[in-house]
Each structure stands twice: as C-alpha cells, then as structure tokens.
Amino acid sequence: MPLYQDEGVVLRTAKLGEADRILTLLTRDHGKVRAVAKGVRRTKSRFGGRLEPFMRVALLIAEGRSLDVVSQAESIAAYAGPICADFQAYTAANVICETADKLVATEKEPAVAQYRLVLGALNALAKHAHEPSTIGDSYVLRALAIAGWTPRLRVCVVCGEPISSALSWYFSIPAGGLMCAADHTPESEAVSWDAICRLSALVDGDWGELDGVPASASIQRETHQIVEEWGEYYLERPIRSMRLLD
C-alpha cells in the first residue's frame, strides 16, 4: 500500500473489532482522513496514548481501499493531558472537534485554514490562555466564517444602516446578521449592544477585548445561544457538545 506522511489532530475515535480503532483526523496537507489504528486498544500498544482525541501527531499512513491504516505516529503536542484535566476545557475541545468534523465534510481535501484554527484553539485550551467556553464560541464562529458564513455585525443586512448603540437591533440567523428596528423580520430576536460587541470580538478573535472586560453571565448566555443556533443553522445539524457549555 502506498505510504504518505502528514501531521494531524485526532478529532474522534470509534472502536473496531477487539483491539482496533477508527480515527477521524484533521491533517495539515490531506484535510480530513479516516484511518484504522491497529492494536491501539491493547495495553502494550506501540502507539501508547498518542492517538487519543485532541492529540497532535506526526503520522505515516498507508492508503487503503476503504480506510487508510496508521503505520507510525509520533507526538507533536500532547494537548489531551491538560485539556482532559479540566472539565470546561474538555467540553470546549469536544465542541471544537465535533464542529471541525462536521464542517470539513469531504475527505482528502486540504483544509489548511481550518487545521490551523483547530490547532490554535486546542493550544489555547491546553495552556488555559482564556476562558474555555469563550474559546469554544470564538472557534465556532471563526470556523464557519472560514467556510463562508460570517455574521454581518456592522450594518443592517437589509438597508445597510451602520450599527449604533443609540438604536435598537435584532439578530436574524437566516438573514445572516443584524437588522435595524425598521427592517427586522418576525423571526429575528432583539439583541443587546453588549452582545453585539462580544459577538464581533468572538468573530475577530479579539482576545484583548474579550479578556479585558469580562462579560456578565447574561451576556455570555445571550451570545452563546446565538453561536449555538448559528452553528446549527449553517451546519444543518446541531453541535451536540455545545449544550454542555451552557
């Protein structure tokens, strides 16, 4: 079987037979790859714990007819340890990996920007750089933005009215962003000015803004609900892990 080298992050695993696992990987050069890790569930597996979710690994993979086969794996960054030791970080990491798995639908198609975003988010969680749920929310919005679904947060999506704290604003997920009071539709929801500012910072990855003035619990709930609904609408299925970030 032809061999290829790459590096990747383990998004999820599934048991196969008595000792094997099917890995879903997001790789730097080959995009999403599904591969079998033979014997990985045995106590004395040569892979050790290198092929667990959230691990970044250098890989040698053999191409197969239906599934590829992992021949070698070496750890690059052991994100799993510090992430799994913190429940909130673990939950956010599951959101990230579930979203990446659903968003990158086609296998063996390069998705470099998505790969780099996943690495940055997992690295931030492992280092406890920011509040875990905020990392998760920011990742979801930025990953969807890379895919072409960026919420419009600076003007009304109907008339182009620039946003202002002096006006009332509504958010419509089907319409793709903010609506002014004159043009908002029945399905749109009123959104607070603080939530608009937080959503903008989440999309931009503006950690100076996000860390500088901590949002109240109510604003965090308001923005998290929008992020969850935005992800579900554009992925056309729920991000189930997000419910644990509430």
Swiss-Prot record:
Keywords for the protein's UniProt record, in alphabetical order: DNA damage, DNA recombination, DNA repair
Superkingdom as given in the UniProt entry: Bacteria
Disulfide bonds: none
GO CC term (a single one): bacterial nucleoid
Annotated InterPro entries: ARFGAP/RecO, DNA_rep/recomb_RecO_N, NA-bd_OB-fold, RecO, RecO_C
SUPFAM superfamilies tied to this protein: ArfGap/RecO-like zinc finger (SSF57863), Nucleic acid-binding proteins (SSF50249)
GO biological process annotation, one example: double-strand break repair
Biological function: Involved in DNA repair and RecF pathway recombination.
UniProt record similarity statement: Belongs to the RecO family.
The protein, known as: DNA repair protein RecO
